[in-house]
Amino acid sequence: MKRVLSLSCLANALLAGAMVLTFTACRDTGTGSSPPASNAGKLRVTATTTMVTDLVKQVGGDRVEAQGLMGAGVDPHLYKASASDVTRLQGAEVIFYSGILLEGKMQEIFEKMAKGGKRVFAVTDSIPKDKLLHPAGGSSHADPHVWFEVPLWAQSIDTVVKGLSDARPADQEYFTQRGEAAKKAMADLHQWAVKRAEELPKEKRILITSHDAFSYFGRAYGFEVVALQGISTVVEAGGADMAKLVDFIKKNKVQAIFVESSVPPATIKRISEDAGVKIGGELFSDAMGTPGQMENGYDLGTYEGMIKHNLDTVVNALK
């Protein structure tokens, strides 16, 4: 009797298992919205700045385990890799960084790892060189702050798709689909930004910040950009630079100037006092905001949230 009962239970168990497998298969492939996942587990990816990490997450989706070295408020110009950072880079299957010497103090590490066979990609490599801006001061390299011209930053998606696909060919179709979706989202974001900027008359579109991170922003959305420091925060501004900026503010009757989340605000506060102009708010320049911090329905810890926060802050302060 016990033997018959055991066989019956076994048959029921096998039947239940088959039903579970059938349901799982339908759930995974029934919609046809994305290709089936490979069996290799999540691809381990390490990225540098918050903007690059966001880009990797957009393209990689649930097939990638992405970790960023830099968080909110971190200045990549001055960032030096710690021992734990190097360990994380060594443990990654793919490394993405922004490039154009934004992470200047880490360049040697990237080059050594690439020579050692590690998959290392500068996401800005897929941006045409003739689209890059060069500072008037005769800097030997282009302005690295390309993420503020949304259509330009969207071209970086191609490098991310390629880098992930090279490491995990079985998921290439998945990464390609997500890359195209990310480009569409950025095209929509750019159109929103253009319309938001147009709420300001051209004569009021003067953006004054701590360092020269917004030239691409100015080109894309019609702002004259004036900064106290150059494209890198490594070189500090002198007294003559501050006096010149104060004169410019007074002459042009600028209504507000702005501090940056990744740059100490002391000099801009001093300019504000000397010129008698208000500080219009804090902009995200070299890093996004804190993930999960919501503002007007968008997450400040995302690329979309960064762009929308900056446009809203600037337009509202200069109206």
Predicted regions and their residues:
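Bacterial N-terminal signal peptides that target proteins for export
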Residues: M1-L14
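Extracytoplasmic metal-acquisition and chelation regions
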Residues: N12, C26-K319
